[in-house]
Amino acid sequence: SVLCCYEFYRIMRLDGKVPNEFVGLVASVLFPLSVLVDPVWLTVINFLLVLLLGLWYVKNPRTRIADVAVTAFGAIYTGYMLSAIVLLREAISGWEGALLSIGVCASLWLSDSFAYMVGSRFGKHKMVPKISPKKSWEGFFGGLFGSVVVWIIIWWTGLYEINLWFSILCGVVVSIMGVFGDLLESRIKPVSYTHLRAH
């Protein structure tokens, strides 16, 4: 999480933002680690992050609200989001919890693979061409199918107390969140490309 957060801040600096890297990077590490101790600490870390960034903003007149926002977003986007998979792993003890975490990742991987295969072969209707020109609705539904297949397999194992419809819903949600993450990343990447071309 700290490497991802650092890279995000590097890109934002190319765009003229000045994040507080120390506070943001520390928060990005503490978010997933705090879950291992007690999920309540997530709230504490959130509070401290807002408090420290508020003090930074008040103390330094040159600090812009955009710098504060970028610092907070970087820590949340990387560390806080990563803590979700840690929470999932800790929710179920033993190897079943580890297997479920791997299953979530596998559903994302298969979703991406099916989206690429279906989209590259049948993709004609673009989702958001201005942000991600190669993403199509055909690929999106192919990705949904791939993710749902993994979750049906998870249900079929009988290791978890979930029914078929809930497993299908999980597959759909994971796939949609994966697409959202891809689009968000695609929205961020042009910042670095633009500045690299300029140099």
Predicted segment positions?
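Membrane-embedded alpha-helical bundles of polytopic integral membrane proteins
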Residues: 1-136, 140-172
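Conserved small/polar residues in nucleotide/adenosyl-binding loops
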Residues: 194-199
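Transmembrane alpha-helical segments of integral membrane proteins
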Residues: 180-193
